Amino acid sequence: MEGSDFLLAGVLFLFAAVAAVPLASRLGIGAVLGYLLAGIAIGPWGLGFISDVDEILHFSELGVVFLMFIIGLELNPSKLWQLRRSIFGVGAAQVLLSAALLAGLLMLTDFAWQAAVVGGIGLAMSSTAMALQLMREKGMNRSESGQLGFSVLLFQDLAVIPALALVPLLAGSADEHFDWMKIGMKVLAFVGMLIGGRYLLRPVFRFIAASGVREVFTAATLLLVLGSALFMDALGLSMALGTFIAGVLLAESEYRHELETAIDPFKGLLLGLFFISVGMSLNLGVLYTHLLWVVISVVVLVAVKILVLYLLARLYGVRSSERMQFAGVLSQGGEFAFVLFSTASSQRLFQGDQMALLLVTVTLSMMTTPLLMKLVDKWLSRQFNGPEEEDEKPWVNDDKPQVIVVGFGRFGQVIGRLLMANKMRITVLERDISAVNLMRKYGYKVYYGDATQVDLLRSAGAEAAESIVITCNEPEDTMKLVEICQQHFPHLHILARARGRVEAHELLQAGVTQFSRETFSSALELGRKTLVTLGMHPHQAQRAQLHFRRLDMRMLRELIPMHADTVQISRAREARRELEEIFQREMQQERR
């Protein structure tokens, strides 16, 4: 791809994302499906703007690589050890059972047994990028089903090596392509990477951080991620697995949060590129020629994987309310199928259109997952938001709620308990099924689902409620919900949680004046206690705290028009000088 073509492709990708994703979100089908549809539109079987799909698809796998690095940062080695049973138990069982069933079905459709085995293994894998993205969107990350889903995905990444090694054996060319010496060298290189990373990464980043240049730190982070991916690719292993291990090795370091911040923008863009590339790879010619075969294959693939995953979740002890989420989010084929099937094709394991048919099946199965998860959400909403059983009725009044609390994490729990203790009628909206089960057990009136859906807000009693308290984890969700409430329920008093100063500015700009910065009040109270321990009179410390709070709020309001501007820096300096003058005047008054 030449320079001008590459630039044109970049512009087309950005345009497709900007146009399709907001439209898909407005239609309620999710960003992932929007990316896939955008890829179909600009790909060789759509408008034909881009034809070199394979090269772009390989490059776009970097999105998955960055995502796995960030996930690794969130898991320390001890946490990974705790997941060993689910990784090597449920993960291994899912791959083996799904592969066996799917291979058997492929043999019934004129696939040779060798091709059927490869096809079964490839179809048994799920899409790491899609599953993790959907788990985040659905708030599954910290739930039991989310942890189990991650374990299955991690085992699938580990299974890449034996799967690729199996291909030449099945093709009858083991003597030429299966060199045990090379495999031994690869294992040694992998172990060397683990040991080197364990003892070298933190000192290296400590040295880089000492320079104080943020750009160098970002460059070093990119070098680590891309270097790990390149090293693993050279070994014939999963690039995503390499960056995941690098993330785990740095999970307990003091640079974890800085690393996440440096990588996050690249991860989002490249993940979008990956999904667009998958959409572009959909061969509509094969789909049209073998429509019935493909449709049946997609249905069977999704059904088999859901059945296996659901049964494993049940055996593992996952709550019944979470099993369908777990099964649905992993029900699609994955990106590894593109690599495995290409390798098998080069070994002449497939005949005719067999490889193309399998790839179309994988791509379409990925497109069904967002829609399937919406159906699962609707089913769960009916299960949890319908009439309650007699023995599950909350002790609060059954009248319409006075307050709706959105999100019931640690922040929302404190608010909910306070309101309940004062006999206020509250309704909670939560999308974590584990939390929903727990809250119902303790007498809360709770609705499961996405609070940005107007129908759910209406069902929860937003039209009759007096106030809504928004405690979402993501600032984007908070602002979207504020906009929806102002548009559809203008009578509601909106109170919101602000994670930091930037979000507080955004809330003020949106007209929300009742908000709480989650760390500000507690930090201010601890600061007051610190002043007292340093010898300041308690009353004086209390006044200092009050002055600081008032000045900070005034600064916050004054800086709304320019909160992203450099003028804020000089204004902040003035505010610090003003605060210092207030403290000095107080000290002088105390001495008199």
Curated annotation (Swiss-Prot):
GO cellular component: plasma membrane
Pfam family membership, one: TrkA_N
Domain RCK N-terminal as annotated: residue spans: 400-519
GO molecular function, one term: glutathione-regulated potassium exporter activity
Record's subcellular location: Cell inner membrane
Any GO BP: proton transmembrane transport
Family per record: Belongs to the monovalent cation:proton antiporter 2 (CPA2) transporter (TC 2.A.37) family. KefB subfamily.
HAMAP family: K_H_efflux_KefB
Name under which the protein is recorded: Glutathione-regulated potassium-efflux system protein KefB
Organism this protein belongs to: Escherichia coli O157:H7
Taxonomy of the source species: Bacteria, Pseudomonadati, Pseudomonadota, Gammaproteobacteria, Enterobacterales
